[in-house]
Amino acid sequence: MLPRFADIFQQGNRWLNWLEKQPEGAVRPVVIESVTKIMACGTTLMGYTQWCCSSPDCCHTKKVCFRCKSRSCPHCGVKAGAQWIQYLLSLVPDCPWQHIVFTLPCQYWSLVFHNRWLLAEISRIAADVILEICHQADVEPGIFTVIHTWGRDQQWHPHIHLSTTAGGVTSGHTWKNLHFYARKVMSMWRYRITRLLSRKYPDLVMPDALAAEGSSKREWNRFLDTHYRRGWNVNVSRVMDNATHVAVYFGSYLKKPPVPVSRLEHYAGQDEIGLRYNSHRTKREEYLLMSGDEFMERFSWHVADKGFRMVRYYGFLSPAKRRLLEEVVYIITETVRKTAMQITWRGMYQRLLKVDP
């Protein structure tokens, strides 16, 4: 039996029909590879193990098919998210944390779409803002960022989720608490992004929507200055008391694939696909109805480039400073190290369905 999510691509040859309509080279190879894996996920095409009854009088066998492990697969994403939570629980120190969401003006979204390398740059800038505030206070924080390209309605909406310790370790190896405020963080973020886009002007591929604004360096800087004068949305959470809340709550939210199966409906044998989502604007659950072609297009936007790291670590959580984390931070925060539990498909099956696959 095919996985439920694969039905979207296979029923009525939705995926192949959409792919044939696209101009040559318009669909990134990684998108084709991801969808191919998703369609084969959980089938014998991915390989399988076969279990046989040990009794010589019984011919009963059972095949357990392998999963695709694609980052865009919602089925495999459940396991990947659960494993990442375990990794976070074993890594982050037990101290206060804050979560910050860095967004861009909507006029910049298409620019990032046509210059996907900017995603890594804006992740680094978000971390640099927090690092600069902390270094001014003689503090080394622990930071991790998660790059998201989708909004709740699956539109293209690049933004950065950043979790940081609400403080950090000083040069004297003591702990110092800090609180981050939206106004200061926003102004630093806005300045650095504007400076980046001005400096990288020669390297940018201008989308059609910004053809006039990007016609010359002078026009481009004028466009950037217009948006620099406006307020940008940077959301800073309240301080959370411990690392467990950070790992479990944000781990389950941030690591999930773009399209959760639980929010999809109304697509069995029909061309229309329904998506339930909680609207930021109305604060209510809304329902979006998409054609098969529209769903394929939106899905293709959010497939990460091969080898691109969606999660990044900075400060004493960065690999280069793990020694500081292990020899100083765990001690002064009195963190009891946890061992990451290994998540397996068999264990998840047994916990959720009470059946040994």
Residue ranges and their predicted role:
Residues 1-357:
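Beta->alpha loop/short-helix hinge microenvironment recognizer with preference
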